[in-house]
Amino acid sequence: MESGAYGVAEAGGSFDLRPFLTQPQVVARALCLVFALIVFSCIYGEGYSNTHKSKQMYCVFNHNEDACRYGSAIGVLAFLASAFLVVDAYFPQISNATDRKYLVIGDLLFSALWTFLWFVGFCFLTNQWAVTDPEDVLVGADSARAAITFSFFSIFSWGVLASLTYQRYKAGVDDFIQNYVDPSPDPNTAYASYPGASVDNYQQPPFTQNAETTEGYQPPPVY
């Protein structure tokens, strides 16, 4: 079981709600969800209005349907990202460091992507609202401004979340480097004998050398 991997202490501990709710990453994620809900609600509720000349409903952002669709889409998908709160709650129970790594990388990529998408959305909505004729907006002007404002706030909330997730990923990488042991053998260490090899315990029998030295030429016996 891995301990201390990716910014979390030991796996298998009991879940405590109060420390969980006070974690910076959980607070940032909650703000992201609230801002996304506000943007989606403003566009869906009062993002469409008719004009004095027609009863047909148009998007209040310069009658550009793409602006309303874009703001609603990223708001809904960002709200559905509340699934990562479940991951944050379950994360300390995951003992496999590889699973933790993939979850953190997925969270990091999603947070970075949504930071960029909120930036694009803020610029898009602001541009379309700037060229909107005020006479064409009978209702929904305040909601349009609120959608733009909280799109701007979402850039920073998702950026902070991406930064915190990167710190968690970096903590896991640093922990792996510190605990890594190089499996390559030390060149200064002598090789151990093969475990199945037999040890040669042969010893020279005693008196062999003496026997060899005495086995020289001997004169024949004299009769």
Curated annotation (Swiss-Prot):
InterPro entries: Marvel, Synaptogyrin. It is found in: Membrane. Signal peptide: none annotated. It is a multi-pass membrane protein. PROSITE patterns: MARVEL. The chain crosses the membrane at residues 26-46, 71-91, 104-124, 146-166. Residues 20-170 form the MARVEL domain. One of its GO terms (cellular component) is synaptic vesicle membrane. Residues 197-223 are annotated as: Disordered. The modification N-acetylmethionine is found at residue 1. Residues 200-216 have a biased composition (Polar residues). The modification Phosphoserine is found at residue 3. Keywords: Acetylation, Membrane, Phosphoprotein, Transmembrane, Transmembrane helix. Belongs to the synaptogyrin family. This is Putative synaptogyrin-2 like protein. The lineage of its organism: Eukaryota, Metazoa, Chordata, Craniata, Vertebrata.
